[in-house]
Amino acid sequence: MTLDAVMKELAAKGSESIKRTYLRHGAPEPLFGVKIGDLKPIQKKLKGQQDIALDLYATKNSDAMYLAGLVADGAKMTRKQLEQWASGATWHLPAGCVVPWVASEHPEGFDIASKWIDSPKPLVAVAGWATLAAIVTITPDDGLPIKQVSTLIDRCVKEIKSAPNRVKYTMNNFIICCGTYVAPLADKAMEAAKKIGAVEVDMGDTDCQVPLAESYIIKSRRGAPVAPKRKTTRC
């Protein structure tokens, strides 16, 4: 499929009600309002078409950007391309979901994300923390830089309450993922969650809430010391 053909199919699947929901959650124009489930058949058609994925993200259309993240292979992206995706995120969904999907697959993902979290641009920092959360979720513990992850947990405890709005949300999620999936740091992450407590984030005109890290970790472990690693964070 060509980029033009994909965009036409996305437009045809758009819904005004879904679009209004996305706009209420912070999405900027342009977008069509395509249900996530309706993107999956298109994703199958585009499997392996890396160039189309890159072109889709570059459109700045929220539906196309989400589809790009479903199609792209992060391991095949260059560091420059990942930087472009992070800096090009138009709102918290591509920054907190799409970019982390691909960045977490890259062999230098941890190093890249560790730099993003220091960015003065909130959406880039969101991409950084969300990528780190994705990495600890899918990477075997023996493949993680445990000391660095431990230091990041300490940083969250110290800085989360003063961080920018959506950055707080992703830092909280990083703590949740460490407590849920990283056995060597599970207890430390739980203690961090207790210290942090409730995190206040302005979620706009939505009913969305920030999960309480301590209770969410317990729920996610399902009675086990930690939950099994996930194969991917894409959804």
Model-derived regions, located:
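Alpha-helical scaffold domains
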Residues: M1-C235
